[in-house]
């Protein structure tokens, strides 16, 4: 068998730069030489790849084992988290010292030392602030006559407790001082109370005819306690429709507590029920519940609930109200409006009542809820706690009621109920 002769013709190289020694080799073994311009860039690729690999490895390790940062925070999955061990209380040094001293005081009280040289005054060093808060000493003697206690009216809205204390300290040592503020807005209500250590200091204050503080004349008066005053158990219900039956009244007011007596006043001229009544409970708790809401829907009308006042309080206030303020007449004999309505001043004698609080400030205090100055109230009988405080309530008797018969032809007469 004949062997074909070897090819003498070799194809030309594909690239001119290919070496001649490779021309006779198979093309599958040949690789072109990389361009010269890429050669300087190749060394920098290796470090970059190494850095990327290191980052990937670090992220993998971090995900498996979270590392702690400064302050105790940890990183897991690329997010910061706050472990339970990081809950620390950062307090200033002064707060820490006060807390440590208070703890030491409590320990000393529970386990008093055998050494008698440690006095109770030392133990009370940090507890005096809580035990003798503002007004605490004044409230402590509210049921007793204290000759060193004074009522200060006509204060400026800008007068602070410090200003009042500094002014009155020139007359004697001030043991306690408080300025009453609105519980909602925190603004001063223009009056306060002061307790002197010595009763003679009160006489010194009263000897001076005129007192001026913060550019305004103030009016200090001696506090007089109303001894033996019982908590209110009797309420006045105004605006009651005469059509409301006694059974309806018992059913509604009996839900608040046990009723002792119900008074339904009658008009002696017309022999008809008047537009108000009185409810007496066996204790004061139902009265507190009733006064939580001023108006109550009873029967077909809305009624207003107030605390009834004794006769002597009413007479005293009527003497003060002569001259215009708190007058019961509502314009030309009672009713305006073409003379068809009958003006019933059914709260005559109950213009001022013992409210749930000194302006709803505290359930133990009675007084003027709408106090806007010091004019027009009884300095000898204002009420702070069990201290009587005179007029200043909104005049309830001036309101008109259309309940009852309407007088014809402009006959406007008033049903003036006298106090019990």
Curated annotation (Swiss-Prot):
It comes from the Eukaryota. The modification Omega-N-methylarginine is found at residues 25, 408. Residues 396-420 are annotated as: Necessary for its nuclear import and export. Interacts with ZNF148. Interacts with TNPO1. Expressed in heart, brain, placenta, lung, liver, skeletal muscle, kidney, pancreas, spleen, thymus, prostate, testis, ovary, small intestine, colon and leukocytes. Expressed in myeloid leukemia, gastric adenocarcinoma, cervical carcinoma, hepatoma, fibrosarcoma, colon adenocarcinoma, epidermoid carcinoma, osteosarcoma and urinary bladder carcinoma cells. GO terms for molecular function: DNA binding; double-stranded DNA binding; poly(A) binding; poly(G) binding; RNA binding; single-stranded DNA binding. The modification N6-methyllysine is found at residue 161. It is linked to Muscular dystrophy, limb-girdle, autosomal dominant 3: An autosomal dominant degenerative myopathy characterized by slowly progressive wasting and weakness of the proximal muscles of arms and legs around the pelvic or shoulder girdles, elevated creatine kinase levels and dystrophic features on muscle biopsy. LGMDD3 is characterized by a mild late-onset and is associated with progressive fingers and toes flexion limitation. Affected individuals may also develop cataracts before age 50. Dimethylation of Arg-408 is probably of the asymmetric type. This is Heterogeneous nuclear ribonucleoprotein D-like. The modification N6-acetyllysine is found at residue 216. It is found in: Nucleus; Cytoplasm. The modification Dimethylated arginine is found at residue 408. Residues 36-52 have a biased composition (Low complexity). It comes from Homo sapiens. One of its GO terms (cellular component) is nucleoplasm. Residues 342-420 are annotated as: Necessary for interaction with TNPO1.
